Amino acid sequence: MMKKVNYSEYEGKYDESIKERLEKDPGSVNVETMRENLYGYTYTKEYADGGIPDELSMDYWEERHEEMELDNLNFEDFEMPDNLDSLLEDMDDSPYFDVSPQEKLILEAIDSTGDGKTPETALCVIDVHQEHEYIQRVVRLSVLQLVRQSVAGGIDCLELRDYDGRIEKVYFDISRRFEVG
């Protein structure tokens, strides 16, 4: 369900324990809780100073997930599947490309704000870097190339070109960053 962000609704909702919760049991955090933390963070002094904490960064969770996978590798228990079909059965139906549970929560929170197809349905992000994190995980950059980026009225438009030369636009609402500074 798409629900545009009313930032004032999230004032005071950022919970500093969210990092620990995401680390220990990401399944205990739902999309609305992630929205509260993501958009509630924009009311903190740290956000006003330009900081984004690890727990709200998809890049952080990607690196953390890779570290955890390396720490838990056990080649003795590794079994090669009998066929490709068994591999495909285990794949998530998620529209996101190879993401950790924490990254998926952030993506779902952003996706719940719009579809990014028009300025009116722009995806709400808390800074420009989060746009690029989103694009890397939702759109395979090997397929699309960033052609142009423009900002008007707090809406950032990324124009991406595919192999056939078609241009696709993705709109992000970054107005909160401009409001806060």
Model-found features: residue ranges?
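N-terminal alpha-helical interaction modules that lie
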Residues: M1-M68, T113, K117-G181
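Alpha-helical protein-protein interaction scaffolds
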Residues: E36-I110
